[in-house]
């Protein structure tokens, strides 16, 4: 080993990527991009078979580093707001009356403006609108009150008027002094009470809030008051176990501070991550593989062994004719070095990435390359037993190459006794008649390759991630051993290597046997490093589950295709020699190693939110078939994806699998029960619970057609008229009598339209002063206020669309029920100069559309009822209290260098 410390002479750089013993540096994200490019080339070959000639698919390779940065940004986002003043829930419209005003629930007013207009023939737009409305509820109600403005009144702490959630300042100027005093007395009674929540002092007061918004606020407050202490202990305890496995210490700096009495803390994410959530995503095996590489794989160098090993074994003679001696001085090209990367990726992800030989006409002409690859391939790869690094075809090609090498007797002739089968390696060699059949690949037992007579998969102490309990032991090496490259590997060996040395000696290849004997310590260090990388750094939620891992090899042999098929990468013959002569030596651990659990938790949480959204949307077609006549499951899949964070979509679609996901994949995923608990998921489920009543989303199927005259009152007493606060609306206080309602379904409308009697039938119903309800289709409802005559398209608008045209001598009719409906409020304003008939027209104005929603959107109230909506209990944290999101503490860790790195 002293030769390694000798002063080496300067070497001329023949290639830009060769520098001494170091060939190149590869980091996790860099290797993930490289792996993604190579994998995509294989995936595209399969995907191209499914593409039609006109279908365009974007096959650009995504930027993995940018995706990870976006997910980290997503983890820093808060799903709640910390505010001093809650949003206004009720506002008032001043009328000419001194004791009456219109009270408007601003939630319904704002909700009516969210989303697009629903139509029957655009189900994707309907699903997208529902998602937007549910998101509006969640975001509107996700607030925490902190340091609310208060004032002192006679020694009592009283809430400022803007905290109460009612806007009434525009009403005060028109009130009498008596009414203003009454409101002031009510405001002075808004006393702040001292409360105690989770051993923390808080302010409690009564305010106003709309029901759906308050449900979200109440759920968020309950989440905080539940303290999440056990969840935090579980997360920190699990991080400790993970840190021990991955050699990471997680900082307790933040956690020593949050227990103070002046701190309110919120834990928005939880650990450990439920791996089932990540692996249930359809066609996600490749995306998870890339994420595993990007977040966990260390940066490393490709180190060459001591050059004296080959000089004193393979090239000691002046003339060298052996295949090994010929290749000893060769230098890899850039493409061959890429193949070396593929080989080490396959070794680090056994079973998930397997290798095959690429067809290279140039190398078929050089038998020395094939022979050498046949020998080193049996020492580099595992083919069977529990997993494989090779395809069956490549294993057979390596067997044939080893067969040719053993029979290539360039030094001395050795006796050969051939077997009866004609299979590769079916012969015995040497004086002791060594049976070479044992080196022929057998995927059932692993014979002939590294897994031969070796326990290369072990289950021992429980791993932090429950889905991946296996420990990989290439060459039988235990990854818990500490590696000192100067001494490690000396005196170590394993069965396949011993048998290879015996067979080479029996074949008369003494120089090569001496070379491999000298390379054994370097070879053992190589696989010891790989074992440590697999069992420590690469252990994550993106690791392949044990049940899938155990099924990879049997499925490969049987030709069965499952959810996680292996990725096959092509390598050249000569790259096996270069891979054998290079070892991947980790130099720096992955930059994202300590924050990987947080990235995983964010990703799983967002997937759970998407799954909950899809479950509810999948029920829509059964609840409202009239508005989703043409709906397919792919529509709500696309709607949820469009409204999901870009980073999460990018991870799910790393291999462009979304272009090929079918309905079976989607529905299977939606129905699977696995979810990742988080604050965002809790609030999303509560928002859907609030949205189960579609009237809270300003959608209704209670829309009627009825001819009604717009009121034109005589102004005999203007003062009395003004005091009554006269207004008109097409909003019904109750549905019409059922015996006066004609249910006009699509089938009835089509029949009448075919007979050319659709308009006549409706006219007859209107003349009888009856009502028509057009199907059970949901409609988008808008709320508008007018203090003058509304436009005719609102006053005389019909709750359906009916168009006729003629083409080719035939008459066609188009009927649509899902149109936008407007609830309007017309406030009458008069002046003392008006005459009694100022509002009277010769011809009356008719309104045709009536709407019934069982919600108090707008109501006329007396002045004394302005504050009657103060009926919600609010909890506000005092200004001197700190509200701290301790989610970020789950990533505050420091990587420990391996003792020998």
From Swiss-Prot:
GO terms for molecular function: structural molecule activity. Signal peptide: none annotated. Keywords: Capsid protein, Inner capsid protein, T=2 icosahedral capsid protein, Virion. GO terms for cellular component: virion component. The keyword Disulfide bond does not apply. It is found in: Virion. It comes from the Viruses. Inner capsid protein that self-assembles to form an icosahedral capsid with a T=2 symmetry, which consists of 120 copies of VP2, with channels at each of its five-fold vertices. This capsid constitutes the innermost concentric layer of the viral mature particle. Function inferred by structural homology with BTV-fold inner capsid family. Homodecamer; each decamer is made up of two conformers of VP2, called VP2A and VP2B. 12 homodecamers assemble to form an icosahedral capsid. Belongs to the turreted BTV-fold inner capsid family. This is Inner capsid protein VP3. It comes from Bluetongue virus 13 (isolate USA) (BTV 13).
């Amino acid at each position: 080993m002293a030769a390694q410390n000798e002063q080496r002479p300067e070497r001329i750089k023949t290639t830009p990527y060769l520098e001494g013993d170091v060939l190149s540096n590869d980091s996790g994200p860099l290797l993930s991009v490289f792996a993604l490019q190579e994998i995509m080339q294989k995936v595209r070959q399969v995907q191209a078979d499914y593409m039609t000639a006109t279908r365009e698919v974007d096959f650009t390779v995504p930027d993995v580093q940018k995706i990870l940065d976006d997910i980290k940004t997503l983890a820093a986002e808060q799903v709640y707001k910390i505010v001093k003043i809650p949003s206004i829930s009720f506002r008032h419209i001043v009328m000419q009356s001194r004791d009456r005003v219109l009270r408007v629930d601003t939630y319904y007013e704002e909700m009516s403006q969210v989303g697009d207009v629903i139509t029957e023939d655009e189900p994707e737009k309907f699903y997208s609108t529902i998602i937007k409305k549910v998101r509006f509820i969640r975001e509107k109600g996700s607030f925490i009150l902190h340091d609310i403005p208060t004032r002192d009144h006679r020694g009592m702490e009283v809430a400022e008027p803007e905290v109460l959630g009612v806007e009434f300042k525009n009403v005060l100027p028109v009130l009498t002094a008596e009414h203003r005093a009454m409101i002031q007395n009510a405001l002075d009674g808004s006393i702040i009470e001292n409360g105690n929540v989770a051993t923390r002092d808080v302010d409690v007061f009564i305010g106003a809030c709309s029901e759906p918004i308050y449900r979200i606020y109440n759920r968020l407050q309950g989440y905080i008051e539940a303290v999440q202490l056990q969840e935090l202990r579980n997360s920190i305890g699990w991080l400790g176990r993970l840190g021990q496995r991955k050699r990471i210490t997680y900082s307790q700096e933040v956690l020593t501070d949050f227990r103070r009495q002046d701190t309110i803390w919120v834990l928005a994410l939880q650990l450990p991550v439920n791996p089932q959530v990540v692996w249930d995503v359809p066609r996600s095996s490749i995306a998870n593989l890339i994420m595993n590489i990007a977040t966990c794989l260390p940066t490393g160098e490709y180190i060459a062994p001591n050059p004296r090993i080959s000089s004193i074994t393979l090239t000691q003679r002046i003339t060298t004719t052996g295949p090994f001696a010929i290749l000893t001085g060769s230098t890899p090209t850039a493409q061959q070095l890429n193949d070396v990367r593929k080989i080490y990726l396959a070794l680090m992800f056994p079973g998930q990435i397997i290798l095959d030989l690429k067809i290279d006409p140039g190398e078929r002409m050089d038998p020395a390359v094939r022979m050498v690859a046949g020998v080193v391939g049996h020492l580099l790869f595992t083919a069977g037993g529990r997993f494989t690094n090779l395809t069956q075809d490549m294993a057979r090609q390596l067997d044939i190459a080893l067969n040719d090498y053993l029979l290539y007797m360039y030094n001395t002739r050795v006796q050969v006794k051939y077997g009866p089968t004609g299979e590769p390696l079916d012969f015995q060699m040497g004086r002791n008649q060594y049976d070479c059949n044992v080196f022929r690949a057998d995927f059932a037992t692993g014979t002939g390759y590294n897994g031969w007579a070796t326990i290369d998969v072990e289950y021992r102490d429980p791993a932090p991630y429950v889905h991946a309990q296996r420990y990989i032991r290439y060459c039988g090496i235990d990854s818990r051993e500490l590696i000192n490259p100067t001494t490690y590997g000396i005196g170590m060996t394993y069965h396949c290597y011993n048998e290879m040395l015996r067979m080479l000696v029996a074949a008369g290849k003494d120089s090569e046997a001496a070379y491999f004997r000298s390379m054994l310590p370097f070879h053992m260090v190589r696989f010891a490093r790989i074992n440590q990388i697999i069992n420590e750094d690469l252990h994550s939620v993106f690791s392949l589950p044990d049940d899938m891992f155990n099924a990879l090899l049997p499925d490969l042999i049987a030709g069965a295709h499952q959810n996680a098929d292996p990725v096959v990468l092509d390598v050249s013959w000569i790259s096996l020699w270069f891979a054998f002569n290079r070892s991947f030596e980790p130099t720096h651990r992955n930059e994202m190693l300590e924050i990987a659990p947080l990235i995983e938790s964010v990703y799983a949480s967002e997937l759970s939110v998407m799954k909950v959204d899809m479950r509810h949307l999948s029920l829509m077609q059964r609840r409202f078939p009239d508005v989703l006549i043409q709906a397919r499951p792919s529509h709500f899949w696309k709607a949820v994806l469009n409204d999901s964070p870009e980073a999460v979509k990018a991870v799910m679609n790393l291999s462009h699998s979304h272009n090929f996901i079918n309905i079976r994949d989607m529905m299977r995923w939606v129905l699977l029960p696995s979810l990742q608990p988080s604050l965002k998921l809790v609030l999303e489920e509560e928002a859907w619970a609030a949205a189960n009543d579609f009237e809270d989303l300003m959608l209704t199927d209670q829309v009627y057609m009825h001819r009604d005259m717009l009121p034109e009152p005589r102004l005999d007493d203007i003062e009395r008229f003004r005091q009554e606060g006269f207004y008109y609306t097409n909003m019904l206080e109750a549905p019409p009598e059922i015996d006066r309602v004609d249910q006009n379904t699509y089938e009835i409308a089509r029949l009448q339209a075919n007979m050319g009697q659709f308009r006549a039938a409706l006219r007859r119903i209107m003349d009888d002063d009856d009502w028509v309800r057009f199907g059970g289709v949901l409609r988008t409802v808008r709320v508008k206020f007018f203090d003058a005559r509304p436009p005719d398209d609102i006053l005389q608008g019909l709750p359906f669309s009916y168009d006729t045209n003629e083409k080719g001598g035939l008459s066609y009719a188009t009927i649509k029920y899902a149109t936008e409906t407007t609830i309007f409020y017309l406030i009458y304003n008069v002046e003392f100069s008006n005459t009694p008939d100022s509002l009277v027209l010769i011809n009356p104005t008719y309104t045709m559309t009536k709407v019934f929603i069982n919600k108090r959107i707008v109501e006329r109230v007396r002045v004394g009822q302005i504050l009657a909506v103060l009926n919600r209990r609010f909890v506000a944290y005092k200004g001197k209290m700190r509200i701290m999101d301790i989610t970020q503490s789950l990533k505050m860790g420091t990587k420990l260098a391996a003792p020998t790195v």
